[in-house]
Amino acid sequence: MKRITGIPTRPNMVQQMLEVGFDYYNQPSSDGSHYWSDNVAYEFTLAEIDKIEEATNELHAMCMDFVADEVKQGDYAHYRFTDLQKNLIEQSWRENAPHLYGRFDFGYDGNNLKMFEYNADTPTSLLEAAVVQWQWLEQVEGLPNRDQFNWIHEELLTRFSMLQQQSGKAGFHFAAMTEAGREDWGNLDYLADVAYNAGWHIHRLSIEDIGYDDDTQQFVDLNNQPIEMLFKLYPLEWMSNTKYAPFMLNSATQFFEPAWKLLLSNKVLLAKLWRKHPNHPYLLPTYFNQHDITERKSIWVKKPLLGREGANVFYYEKSNGLEFAAKGSEHSNFYANAGYIYQQKFELPNFDGMYPVIGSWVVGDVACGMGLREDFTAVTGNDSHFIPHYFVE
């Protein structure tokens, strides 16, 4: 794994970005640098890519087994779920509600590969990973004999086609919050476009414009048309706490992601996976509280069970009991009362003052590509940059 700099900018880079809907490429970081640059990339070997792909497939299979066990046992003590959320989880799992995609976040130092978390509900940077970095790979000059771990787009097409065949439905609604930024809507537009090319009739709307028809007992759009299939770039834990949430039970609407993914998008997963698979090579020791930690010399990352963009992350030193805010993490009262886990700190490599995190994508049940984000700190937050990758044999 190497960080390559000095790659020439494509003469028509801006035009290429805009043509694929990546109009937030120049979103600024705090230092004024842009979210995307043609000039930097990460180089991997084929052996490293094989390792990442194999780990992703193995961890996803472990997570699916984990969901099955959790539902079978019905032990949701650590999650702080409502009764309705428990019912939604169990109903969606019993009905084999299909899923679309997810993204593992990995730390990798060229030798050790460790799972940080599974963004199984509302992962973004999909457009960047599936389309933008592939376009870059095909057009950039000066990188001979390169390839990329990336067939995300093809797997999405296959998945949307399969969903249509299985459901027998024709229409698919795609929704996000009205006030969501261009990154969210850019990712949503991309998914809607893929679904359209797979044969679906597409409808876009804001989450706030979803209604419920008491007479037909169906979720409907602004035209009072039934919503049969809904992809929502809106967290399940939020949606399942709205006034319409009780209507999700026994609803004719198929939600993406399904409610059983509440078990994977919550960081309870990390502690329970470690308990179930102690010393697994791709897992970091993770516990629910400080008292369970036995490795006194390690630094531990205190993460909220529900949190996004590196919010509310702390470091804890077992040897002296000190706890302090992690550099690069912003505090949000929204996540302050969500509960926490303690995950052993993994030392990310420092390349020219930047810390990369690998996002490895799963579509359906298939590992199919990756993208990287790097930040000025070991906590990946709103200042991060998306960096393309390639590999050489």
Mark where each language-model region is.
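Preference for protein termini
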Residues: 1-393
